[in-house]
Amino acid sequence: MELRVGNRYRLGRKIGSGSFGDIYLGTDIAAGEEVAIKLECVKTKPPQLHIESKIYKMMQGGVGIPTIRWCGAEGDYNVMVMELLGPSLEDLFNFCSRKFSLKTILLLADQMISRIEYIHSKNFIHRDVKPDNFLMGLGKKGNLVYIIDFGLAKKYRDARTHQHIPYRENKNLTGTARYASINTHLGIEQSRRDDLESLGYVLMYFNLGSLPWQGLKAATKRQKYERISEKKMSTPIEVLCKGYPSEFATYLNFCRSLRFDDKPDYSYLRQLFRNLFHRQGFSYDYVFDWNMLKFGASRAADDAERERRDREERLRHSRNPATRGLPSTASGRLRGTQEVAPPTPLTPTSHTANTSPRPVSGMERERKVSMRLHRGAPVNISSSDLTGRQDTSRMSTSQIPGRVASSGLQSVVHR
């Protein structure tokens, strides 16, 4: 049975969940392209997906903003069809053994500051800045950082007059506690400064592998938030950033010094990290850690395969004394065995297919996994966002949740 939305998009398997609603892999039937489809039950009050889709539409045209293909209602669901993206920074962080190099962190920081600045220029704050909500593009856009999930976004100023929202206190925590600003923990209304402070914690998370306030135990969620808040406030910025370039501490101190309605100096923050980038002698080649890991795994797999073939060739010759001294091709023909072709060297720019059947080594499996991850395919993921990945740990290729199948979405049965 084939499920369709908007009479143009084929609904596939579930690939994640956003702030509100579930996300599915889909196909644009006319174009033959894969898309991401976000669904929300029409009974949801207020209709969060409708609000989020309106924000996305306001953001359209910005660099690193996913393209919206279609919005509407289908059966019992509100639907938003979006551009399909690659893995999140959280997925890639795990892929890189939870450690990014300084070069990769600085390349990311530059783009992430720009994404947040763009959202602010459109009169909104994101309020959930975290690694899961930054995704890499696919194909030619593989080096572009996207920002997603506007389910918690809020307008902070009037679009026409630029009148800022008023300062308020006693607000509940909105966002993710791990990356929330101190003022957010204190119940203060969020503004532009809070998005940027959250980004500072994300960058230190990439440096450290984890933040000091992770893994704290508590009986209730409220108590856990309080423990995180206490640890965050009792950890001086200089202690958090100790052992890393001073620019990270400078960044966080700058964010914390901003007043509620201040416009941040985004250019200053970008330049802070760009100057560090140049002093380190890095090149703006947009080669991230996961690119190197992918290529390194490919080279290692190729070397291992070459070594395996050499071993087999030596073993074959040792078992067949009559063929010693003959070229391998001649001996192969003489004995009626299959000719063994020399392995094709793997280079970054050329991949020659080898159609000969052969066992797949562990190293080669790792290479394929790394390449699939780089393209956005599933590798033990659990992201909460719009991605081009499949959560195979929870759902098989053929599974589509029953509540979607019975929703009144257009069904096409091929016999």
UniProtKB/Swiss-Prot annotation:
* Enzyme class, first EC level, given as a word: transferase
In residue numbers, the region (Autoinhibitory) covers 317-342
Domain annotation Protein kinase: ranges: 9-277
Q: Which residues carry this modification: Omega-N-methylarginine?
A: R375
Q: Please give the subunit comment from the record.
A: Monomer. Component of the circadian core oscillator, which includes the CRY proteins, CLOCK, or NPAS2, ARTNL/BMAL1 or ARTNL2/BMAL2, CSNK1D and/or CSNK1E, TIMELESS and the PER proteins. Interacts with DNMT1 and MAP1A. Interacts directly with PER1 and PER2 which may lead to their degradation. Interacts with MAPT/TAU, SNAPIN, DBNDD2, AIB1/NCOA3 and ESR1. Interacts with AKAP9/AKAP450; this interaction promotes centrosomal subcellular location. Binds to tubulins in mitotic cells upon DNA damage. Interacts with GJA1.
The alphabetical list of record keywords is: ATP-binding, Biological rhythms, Cell membrane, Cytoplasm, Cytoskeleton, Golgi apparatus, Kinase, Membrane, Methylation, Nucleotide-binding, Nucleus, Phosphoprotein, Serine/threonine-protein kinase, Transferase, Wnt signaling pathway
- Tell me which residues bind ATP: I15, G16, S17, G18, S19, F20, G21, D22, I23, K38
Annotated localization = Cytoplasm; Nucleus; Cytoplasm, Cytoskeleton, Microtubule organizing center, Centrosome; Cytoplasm, Perinuclear region
Q: Which family does it belong to?
A: Belongs to the protein kinase superfamily. CK1 Ser/Thr protein kinase family. Casein kinase I subfamily.
Q: Can you say what this protein is called? A: Casein kinase I isoform delta
Known function: Essential serine/threonine-protein kinase that regulates diverse cellular growth and survival processes including Wnt signaling, DNA repair and circadian rhythms. It can phosphorylate a large number of proteins. Casein kinases are operationally defined by their preferential utilization of acidic proteins such as caseins as substrates. Phosphorylates connexin-43/GJA1, MAP1A, SNAPIN, MAPT/TAU, TOP2A, DCK, HIF1A, EIF6, p53/TP53, DVL2, DVL3, ESR1, AIB1/NCOA3, DNMT1, PKD2, YAP1, PER1 and PER2. Central component of the circadian clock.
GO BP field: circadian regulation of gene expression; positive regulation of proteasomal ubiquitin-dependent protein catabolic process; protein phosphorylation; regulation of circadian rhythm; Wnt signaling pathway
Spell out the Polar residues composition-biased ranges. Answer: 347-358, 380-400
Annotated PROSITE patterns: PROTEIN_KINASE_ATP, PROTEIN_KINASE_DOM, PROTEIN_KINASE_ST
Start and end residues of each stretch annotated as Centrosomal localization signal (CLS): 278-364
Any one Pfam family match given in the protein's UniProt record, by short name:
Pkinase
- Gene3D superfamilies under this entry? Transferase(Phosphotransferase) domain 1 (1.10.510.10)
Q: Which gene encodes it?
A: CSNK1D
Q: Does the keyword Iron apply?
A: no
